[in-house]
Amino acid sequence: MKIALGIQYNGKNYCGWQRQENVASVQEQLEKAISFVANQPCQIFCAGRTDSGVHATGQVVHFETDAIRAEKAWSFGVNANLPDDISVSWAKCVTDDFHARFSATARRYRYILYCNKLRSAILPEGVTHCHLDLDHHLMHQAGQALLGEQDFSSFRAAQCQSHTPFRNVHHLKVVRRGQYIIVDIQANAFVHHMVRNIVGSLIEVGAGHQPVEWIGWLLAQKDRRLAAPTAKPEGLYLVNVSYPTQFQLPQNALGPLFLENELG
């Protein structure tokens, strides 16, 4: 049988999603817990591999097993064998044609900036502190240049292994909630470090260091060296993965925490 799981995790203590030698990974912890419940080795596949320190409220994985368990038994059983910073939010038996990565039609991320001259002791590992006075309206306006299918070489990490720099951005919103600025972006997929590189450059616009038109200009140059430094990982969350309705996967609140599903 093939099982899909909704996964949440705090990425602080992990060197990213993917299993690696001699370092902690989210994949390793999940595979250990699932294999224990299944009473056999299980390999999992995820919708999107997050980097070191990046979080998720809406990651999706799947695995295959001969073990017969109720959906509730998978979610509760796996949770009982996971560390506190990783959890299963739902479990569902899926058809053989489902694949967590290749069946996905879109991924959605949110990046949270805490804007204050002084750092906060509350959620320091879940937001990125920014001491600059940012204009989120300018950031939102600048981000609209990134919509549609375009070449994102200017926002692509040098070590990116993707065969193409082209991605299709469905929406990009920048909103403020009190002292927090949230960048909400959805695309069919993302090149390596794409969201954090975009946020780093939007911060330059929000701080008044660059004009609104700079983001569109950067995109056209197709040169990563011209863009701003990569934003830190701790403010970034994978909040949702979209699939065709035929799979009927559960839908959780996007979050994280207090954030509503649709940011006006």
Curated annotation (Swiss-Prot):
Known Gene3D superfamilies for this protein?
A: Pseudouridine synthase I, catalytic domain, C-terminal subdomain, Pseudouridine synthase I, catalytic domain, N-terminal subdomain
Q: Which residues bind substrate?
A: Y109
**SUPFAM superfamilies recorded for this chain?**
Pseudouridine synthase (SSF55120)
| Enzyme type, top EC level | isomerase
Q: Which reaction does it catalyse?
A: uridine(38/39/40) in tRNA = pseudouridine(38/39/40) in tRNA
Note whether Isomerase occurs among the keywords. Answer: yes
Q: Which Pfam families match?
A: PseudoU_synth_1
What EC number(s) are associated with this protein in UniProt?
5.4.99.12
Concerning its family, UniProt says:
Belongs to the tRNA pseudouridine synthase TruA family.
| Name this protein carries in UniProt | tRNA pseudouridine synthase A
Q: Which gene encodes it?
A: truA
